[in-house]
Amino acid sequence: MTAIAVGELWRYPVKSMGGTRVAAVRIDRRGVHADRLWAVRDLDNDITATARRVPALLRCTAEYRTEPGPAAGPGNVPEVLITFPDGVRRCSTDPDIDEHLSELAGRRMRLTPLPEESDTSVHRLRWRQLLAAYAPSAVRKDFGLADSDKLIDTSIFSLREVATLARFSTPPGTFVDLSPVHLLSTTSLASLSTDGTGFD
């Protein structure tokens, strides 16, 4: 059997932004501790923004101002620093942070901390959003599928997961789409970078 070594660990303080390389992580029921405790809300569409729908977010990186303590989590979110594509850094407490995010995205945005798990207000989908999100064309776009490709097989998801996905943009208590932890091999990352684009 070939030995496997961990090459890098990354934590992503803000959903859909670049993250921070860290020396160690703690895995809990939500995934990596203090991962994706912030998200950007698309105010015009009343939904949590994703990199698929607002790719400009990927041009930013985020890090915590200080290392999150063990109590960090839903409803107890530490300050975050965001580095914008022009190199300007803004803190989550800066009064103009939302203006900068809105300018970057080209529409009204708001940086939002993860609320308590019982508060589903930032997760709940409206009917029009639900219908739009699960239209075959939207699913194909989200998963990078061509019109001629088969749609994904949803039988891999439990009934509870499907019900959660049908009601919420992200599961309550987290800003992850579905999988709280991703394990990638260096070979997989290298194959994604064949054109010279770097991935973290």
Task: Name these PLM-found stretches.
Residues 1-199:
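Electropositive, beta-rich accessory/interaction domains or terminal extensions
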